[in-house]
Amino acid sequence: MKTTFLDFEQPIAELEAKIEELRFVQDDSAVDISEEISRLAGKSQQLTKDIYANLTPWQVAQIARHPQRPYTLDYVREIFTDFHELHGDRTFADDLSIIGGLARFNGQSCMVIGHQKGRDTKERAMRNFGMPKPEGYRKAKRLMELADKFGLPIFTFVDTPGAFPGIDAEERGQSEAIGHNLYVMAGLRVPLIATIIGEGGSGGALAIAVGDVVQMLQFATYAVISPEGCASILWKTAEKAPEAAEALGLTAHRLKALGLIDKIVSEPLGGAHRDYKGMAALLKRSLAESLRQFQGMSVKELQARRYERLLAYGKFKETGAQD
């Protein structure tokens, strides 16, 4: 699959194009230019390191939305075995923007739930661009309750611009569905490990992300609104999205500093879309470490830990009035 380069990656794209051109020439020539190819490859790698070491929040948001970034089903294929997808909310319909089912993680039975976008126009429409309707969240709730009943740990993967804002979704109780999920997750008797793998868009993301461990991939984002939406409200123009991204503090490192997430999972050089298997291996290791800390923990201890965790959000300290 040919790599799609973002605007700020154009210097890398030009180098990679030159390397491909030289490889093509080498195949049709008796002249050995392997040293030049190696030199340019090293230069490209160093340039990628330099660019990715100084990303702005807006550039991180672009990476989180990269069309070639791994989605939930990509991680399911690489990390889990014996995945059996379960469908429908048993109330209205089967929302394909959320997928879920039974699987095995390192041989242990578990439940996997996640947002799913699409690769081409047809699949994106089928998946509603990763924006769930109420039936999607109710499907997720049904699967969480099923996992709770059988004592299965839950892994969720978050990647959505947000909950679908259409009239039909509102008519069927979008906010109620999200709120009910938050209630259910808070009381689960099994561990829930949530991973933000791409976009973490507002309540649409939170609806499957009230976890005992919340982790983010290095170039994922998590915020109450998209940069464009924030800019449109504050500055009346989406062109201010870069400034909005800065103000939102949507990057993994910023959220970790604020105590809103627990872990950051490093990505391969150039982002997760450059190396699916490498990214999956890093994520699998992190998931195993997260799950291990709940071994031997009683339900009472697990729920008490989660309760304390939830109450810790938004704490503030009072200071004496200044003269």
From Swiss-Prot:
Subcellular location: Cytoplasm
Record pathway: Lipid metabolism; malonyl-CoA biosynthesis; malonyl-CoA from acetyl-CoA: step 1/1
Main location: cytoplasm
Catalytic activity: N(6)-carboxybiotinyl-L-lysyl-[protein] + acetyl-CoA = N(6)-biotinyl-L-lysyl-[protein] + malonyl-CoA
Signal peptide positions on this chain: none
GO CC terms: acetyl-CoA carboxylase complex
EC top class, as a word: transferase
GO biological process: fatty acid biosynthetic process; malonyl-CoA biosynthetic process
The CoA carboxyltransferase C-terminal domain, residue ranges: 39-293
GO molecular function, one term: acetyl-CoA carboxylase activity
UniProt feature coiled coil, ranges: none
Pfam family, one: ACCA
Top-level taxon: Bacteria
Swiss-Prot/TrEMBL keywords: ATP-binding, Cytoplasm, Fatty acid biosynthesis, Fatty acid metabolism, Lipid biosynthesis, Lipid metabolism, Nucleotide-binding, Transferase
EC number: 2.1.3.15
HAMAP family: AcetylCoA_CT_alpha (MF_00823)
Described function: Component of the acetyl coenzyme A carboxylase (ACC) complex. First, biotin carboxylase catalyzes the carboxylation of biotin on its carrier protein (BCCP) and then the CO(2) group is transferred by the carboxyltransferase to acetyl-CoA to form malonyl-CoA.
Similarity comment text for this entry: Belongs to the AccA family.
Complex and partners: Acetyl-CoA carboxylase is a heterohexamer composed of biotin carboxyl carrier protein (AccB), biotin carboxylase (AccC) and two subunits each of ACCase subunit alpha (AccA) and ACCase subunit beta (AccD).
Alphabetized PANTHER family for the sequence: ACETYL-COENZYME A CARBOXYLASE CARBOXYL TRANSFERASE SUBUNIT ALPHA (PTHR42853), ACETYL-COENZYME A CARBOXYLASE CARBOXYL TRANSFERASE SUBUNIT ALPHA, CHLOROPLASTIC (PTHR42853:SF3)
Name recorded for this polypeptide: Acetyl-coenzyme A carboxylase carboxyl transferase subunit alpha
